[in-house]
């Protein structure tokens, strides 16, 4: 089995590429980073440091790479069985054009084999978004063939992969936590679900998408925003602060109650899931910088993202949400001169005040009780 994977960064190599390779899938990475592509082509392997209760180094083999702006990647799409991505939500619309060119050439070559495409991104229904972008670049005459032969499979992915350590001179080595979760919507495949160890299938993907978004993502960013306020440098430092740990756990319990009401998750099992995530944040082998997790606050404050979406759920079900509100207030306190979104957010705050800024970026009514509570909390945070 062959796969083309867009994005040879840490998540691509340390998570999706490794899972595929471990199941004997021949992986071709596609990326714009020329030195990275050249090194992958030369070595055709790389090391992954897997850290949990212990540390082990695995070697991923039988991989290669092409430049994602070249004709090579289009030719690879013609003959591949699977396309996956880990490029970041903002890059999907860029690679969609390349995928559309590859599909066009595939159809022109009369390749009738089914092809499945899976976007492995930190966004809800990311592959559906990618599909819409691909179809916008695909000639109308090919839409019916695409509907018949190409599966656009939504997924939920979860693995903490921090940036590589600066002291490491191995361009390809990547560090990942031992925990990983890759869940796919089995209803969207064409030609059956491939047998890939580490890729779990479900017929109720949204339950798992929101479980991850409302727990891992919500807890992670609140840890970062509260940690930034207290001067912590890493997620581990922040979550070992007893006050922050208590508040992060409470926020995940508030969002967790939404999940329990909405999807019927078992209360005790979900409590154990929260504890597991708190343990992951405290992993001594991971140096996960606060600024990596806190960056792009505007995206994270979107109404369908990790702070506002669970808050809206608490409003829907009449659930306590005071700690989620504090996490949202802390996000508006985040200052980082090297992050354009953080700069934009602080500029808007200075020019328009909190309530107007809150309404502008989150969609919350500035006269709502939640907005008033967030404003009250905001004024108490230093």
Swiss-Prot record:
Pfam families: Mannitol_dh, Mannitol_dh_C
Gene Ontology terms: biological process: mannitol catabolic process
Membrane found in the keyword field: no
EC number: 1.1.1.17
Group of enzyme by EC: oxidoreductase
Keywords attached to this entry: NAD, Oxidoreductase
Gene3D superfamilies, per the entry: N-(1-d-carboxylethyl)-l-norvaline Dehydrogenase, domain 2, NAD(P)-binding Rossmann-like Domain
Catalytic activity: D-mannitol 1-phosphate + NAD(+) = beta-D-fructose 6-phosphate + NADH + H(+)
GO molecular function, one term: mannitol-1-phosphate 5-dehydrogenase activity
UniProt KW NAD keyword: yes
Residues reported to bind NAD(+): 3-14
GO cellular component assignments: cytosol
Matching InterPro entries: 6-PGluconate_DH-like_C_sf (IPR008927), 6PGD_dom2 (IPR013328), Mannitol_1_phos_5_DH (IPR023028), Mannitol_DH (IPR000669), Mannitol_DH_C (IPR013118), Mannitol_DH_CS (IPR023027), Mannitol_DH_N (IPR013131), NAD(P)-bd_dom_sf (IPR036291)
UniProt record similarity statement: Belongs to the mannitol dehydrogenase family.
Identification of the protein by name: Mannitol-1-phosphate 5-dehydrogenase
Protein source organism: Aliivibrio salmonicida (strain LFI1238)
């Amino acid at each position: 089995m062959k796969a083309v994977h867009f994005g040879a960064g840490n998540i691509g190599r340390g998570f999706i590429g490794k899972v595929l390779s471990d199941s004997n899938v021949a992986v071709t990475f596609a990326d714009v980073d020329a030195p990275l592509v050249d090194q992958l082509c030369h070595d055709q392997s790389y090391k992954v440091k897997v850290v949990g209760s212990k540390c082990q180094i695995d070697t991923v083999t039988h991989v290669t790479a092409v430049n994602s702006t070249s004709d090579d990647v289009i030719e690879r799409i013609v003959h591949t069985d699977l396309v996956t991505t880990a490029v970041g939500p903002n890059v999907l619309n860029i690679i969609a054009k390349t995928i559309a060119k590859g599909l066009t050439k595939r159809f022109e070559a009369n390749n009738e084999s089914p092809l499945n495409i899976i976007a492995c991104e930190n966004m809800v229904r990311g592959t559906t978004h990618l599909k819409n972008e691909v179809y916008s670049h695909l000639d109308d005459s090919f839409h019916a063939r695409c509907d018949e032969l190409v599966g656009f499979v939504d997924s939920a992915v979860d693995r903490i992969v921090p940036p590589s350590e600066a002291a490491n001179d191995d361009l390809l080595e990547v560090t990942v936590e031992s925990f990983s979760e890759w869940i796919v919507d089995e209803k969207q495949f064409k030609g059956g679900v491939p047998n890939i160890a580490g890729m779990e299938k479900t017929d109720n993907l949204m339950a798992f998408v929101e479980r991850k978004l409302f727990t891992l993502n919500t807890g992670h960013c609140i840890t970062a925003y509260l940690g930034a306020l207290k001067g912590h440098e890493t997620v581990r430092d922040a979550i070992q602060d007893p006050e922050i740990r208590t508040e992060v756990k409470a926020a995940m319990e508030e969002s967790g109650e939404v999940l329990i009401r909405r999807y019927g998750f078992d209360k005790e099992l979900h409590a154990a899931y929260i504890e597991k995530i708190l343990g992951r944040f405290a992993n001594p082998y991971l140096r996960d910088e606060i600024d990596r997790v806190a960056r792009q606050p505007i995206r994270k404050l979107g109404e369908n993202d990790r702070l506002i979406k669970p808050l809206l759920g608490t409003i829907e079900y009449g659930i306590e949400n005071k700690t989620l509100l504090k996490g949202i207030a802390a996000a508006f306190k985040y200052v980082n001169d090297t992050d354009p979104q953080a700069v934009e957010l602080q500029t808007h705050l200075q020019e328009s005040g909190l309530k107007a800024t809150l309404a502008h970026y989150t969609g919350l009514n500035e006269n709502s009780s939640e907005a008033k509570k967030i404003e009250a909390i905001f004024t108490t945070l230093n």
